């Protein structure tokens, strides 16, 4: 059974903001901040849900696979499809200046930064216009080195310190966007 806040993508829905498509999400929050979560491998989903509930922010959990989400009308599950970059494309097409994107996918982060969104890695590291070019270049270099066999292994493990840094960065990002909206 599909819940009211689950959403399948369609061309018509893609042309409208999420609030226009879902009566349960419209007029439920005091701000227009939205968090988009690249959810398939995100280690901080529970932290996002807690911060969003406390600050009354809508969350779109975007994945190619089924992801369990809390029973909360401010949190929606987006089934972006099974294409290789379907979830990334869905997020990148919608992210804007009042949005926060949580992803460890560097190409997606680059697309969202260019769209004006605030982008955070799960370890709390912000991606910015100043840093994204170098971050993308390093990612591409590491991919080439791994494929040639010169480097084996992956990134270091996720730590409690990373989780704490993420919580702080997310809270600061939401409050910064809300302050900017209230002065506009």
What are these regions (language model features)?
Residues 21-184:
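Nuclease catalytic cores that cleave nucleic-acid phosphodiester bonds
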Residues 1-26:
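N-terminal amphipathic/basic-hydrophobic helices that include classical n-h-c signal peptides
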């Amino acid at each position: 059974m599909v819940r009211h806040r689950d959403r399948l993508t369609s061309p018509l829905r893609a042309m409208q903001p999420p609030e226009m498509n879902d009566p349960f999400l419209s007029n439920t929050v005091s701000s227009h901040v939205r968090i988009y979560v690249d959810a398939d491998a995100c280690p901080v989903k529970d932290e996002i849900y807690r911060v969003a509930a406390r600050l009354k922010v809508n969350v779109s959990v975007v994945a190619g696979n089924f992801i369990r989400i809390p029973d909360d009308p401010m949190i929606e599950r987006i089934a972006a499809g099974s294409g290789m970059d379907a979830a990334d494309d869905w997020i990148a097409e919608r992210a804007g200046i009042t949005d926060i994107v949580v992803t460890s996918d560097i190409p997606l982060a680059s697309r969202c930064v260019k769209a004006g969104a605030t982008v955070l890695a799960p370890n709390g590291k912000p991606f910015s216009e100043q840093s994204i070019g170098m971050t993308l270049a390093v990612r591409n270099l590491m991919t080439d080195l791994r494929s040639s066999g010169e480097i084996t292994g992956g990134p270091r493990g996720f730590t409690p310190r990373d989780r704490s840094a993420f919580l702080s960065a997310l809270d600061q990002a939401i409050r910064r966007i809300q302050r900017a909206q209230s002065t506009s």
